Amino acid sequence: MGLDKDGISNIAKERIASSLVEDTKDLAAELCKHFYNQGWVSGTGGSITLKVLESDVDVQERLIVMAPSGVQKERMLPVDMYVLSSDGTVLSAPPAKGAPHKPPKCSECCPLFLKAYKMRNAGAVIHSHGLESCLATMINPTAKEFRITHMEMIKGIAGHGYYDELVVPIIENSAREYELTDALAAAMEAYPKATAVLVRNHGIYIWGDSWISAKTQAECYHYLFNAALKLHQLGLDPADAKHGPLTRPQTLPDFANKRATSKNVFVLDIEGTTTPISFVTEVLFPYARENVSSFFKSTYNSPETLNDIRLLRDQVHEDLRNNVPGATEIPVESAGIDAVVAAIEKNVQAMIKADRKVTALKELQGHIWRIGYENGELKGSVFEDVPEALAKWDARGIKTYIYSSGSREAQKLIFGNTNFGDLRVYLSGFFDTTIGHKREARSYKEIFLTLGVDHPSCITFATDVLAEAVAAKEAGLQAVLLLRPGNAPLPSDHGFRTAKSLLEL
C-alpha cells in the first residue's frame, strides 16, 4: 500500500477526494449556518461533525468531517472542514487564510465526538452552546440530571415517548474542552438510553445515527429546556406528570449545617508534599524526556498533538523574542515530520533541563505520561500518610484540591494511578499554572475566588517551597511547609508552621 510523506495511503486519498466527502462538507457548512441562526454556535463556540455516508464501509470505519475551532460558524465554507479517519487522525486540513484569520485548528471537541462515534455508533454529533442548554443545568446547581416528562416534543428524542421521563445526565464543566472526555464517556456508559449529555454552565452534546436524527433531537432538546425554564418560572415542576407546583426540598434546612462542617479547605502541592521529589525528578521527567520523539511520531496528526505543537510554537516564538537559552526555531509543516519533530525535541529537552513551568511543556508532559500510565510503564507515587489524610478529611466534609505546576491531566494521572490505588475520589478539583504562577499572590487570590469560601484564611495551602508559602500568605491563605525526605532545606527564620505528615494538618 503506497503512503505519502504524511503517512496517508492512496486508498485513503481516493476516499477523501470522493463526491461523498464533498457532499458531507457542503452539508456541514450549511448546518453550521443554520445552527448559528438558532443561537447554538455564536461567538465561534459549538461545533458539528458528520460521518461520511460511505455505504460500502462499516459505520465505525467511515471517514469523519468535522468543523474547525475558533471560526465564525455563519461564514463557514465546505473548504474549511477537516476530514479525519475513524480513529481521529487528520487526513485533510483546510488551507490557512490571511489576516485577520487565525491558522486553522481542528475542533477541541474532537476527543468527545470520537467517544460518541465509538460508544454510540453515531452518524453525527452536535455540540451546542445554546443559552437554554446552559440555563437548564442551573435550575438546580447540584443536580446530576435534567428531567422532564409529559411534553409532546419528548417524542422527538430517540427511544422516548410522550409518557416517558426524559433524563439527561449533567457533567461538570472544565476550562478546556478535551478535559471533559472521560466525564462524557462515564455519563454515556451510566445512561445507555441517553442521546445527549449536558455540561453545566456550558452547553450540550447530542448525537444520532444520522445528521437528520441529531438535528431533530437537538431542536427537541432545546425546546424542552426552554419549556422547563418557563415551567420553573411559573413555579411548576417539569418532572411531574401533571406539572404541578414545585415542592421545596425537605433537606434545605440542613444546608447551613453542611456548610459549617466543610467551610475549611485544603489545597495541596504535589512534588515534595504529597509525592516524593525523587518520583518527579527520577521517574516522570526522564520518561517524558526519553519519549518526546516517539510520542510525536506516533501521534503527529491527532488533534491533541497538533494542539501541543501549536502551543510549543507559540512558546518558542516568545522564547526567541526574549533570547531564552536553548530556544530553537521550529520549521513549518512543509519541512516534513522529521524536521519538525527534531526541532520540537530540542526545545522540549531544553525546557525540561531548565525545569520551565510553562503551559506548553506541562501539557505535553501530561500527554506523554498518560501513555506511560496506560501501558503500565508508570505508576503514581504518594507518601504513606496521604491516602489516610485524604480519607479522614473527606469523612469530615473537608474538601481537598491540588495546585501544581504540572498540568491538571498530569495531576489526575498521578492520583488516579498511585501505589495506594485511585485517590481521585477524595479530591474536589485540580489547579495548574493556567490560574497563575505558584509564586505569585494573585494566583492564590484566584483560587480563593474560585473555591467560594468565606475568607482566604479558610484555605490551608501545603507546600515544600518557601516562595509559594510566602505568596499564599500574602493572599491571606494559611500556609504550611512540609518537611519530607529529599526536600530542600529551609532557612531557620522562615516563620511558617511546618509538618512532617499531612495527618498533622
Curated annotation (Swiss-Prot):
The active site is at E152 (proton donor/acceptor). Keywords: Amino-acid biosynthesis, Hydrolase, Lyase, Magnesium, Metal-binding, Methionine biosynthesis, Multifunctional enzyme, Zinc. GO terms for cellular component: cytoplasm. One of its GO terms (molecular function) is magnesium ion binding. The keyword Magnesium applies. Pfam families: Aldolase_II (PF00596), Hydrolase (PF00702). Its cofactor is Zn(2+); Mg(2+). Zn(2+) binds at H127, H129, H202. Mg(2+) binds at D269, E271, D464. Substrate 1 binds at C109. Its EC number is 4.2.1.109, 3.1.3.77. It catalyses: 5-(methylsulfanyl)-D-ribulose 1-phosphate = 5-methylsulfanyl-2,3-dioxopentyl phosphate + H2O; 5-methylsulfanyl-2,3-dioxopentyl phosphate + H2O = 1,2-dihydroxy-5-(methylsulfanyl)pent-1-en-3-one + phosphate. Substrate 2 binds at S404, S405, K438. The keyword Hydrolase applies. Residues 1-237 are annotated as: Methylthioribulose-1-phosphate dehydratase. Residues 266-505 are annotated as: Enolase-phosphatase E1. In the N-terminal section; belongs to the aldolase class II family. MtnB subfamily. This is Probable bifunctional methylthioribulose-1-phosphate dehydratase/enolase-phosphatase E1.
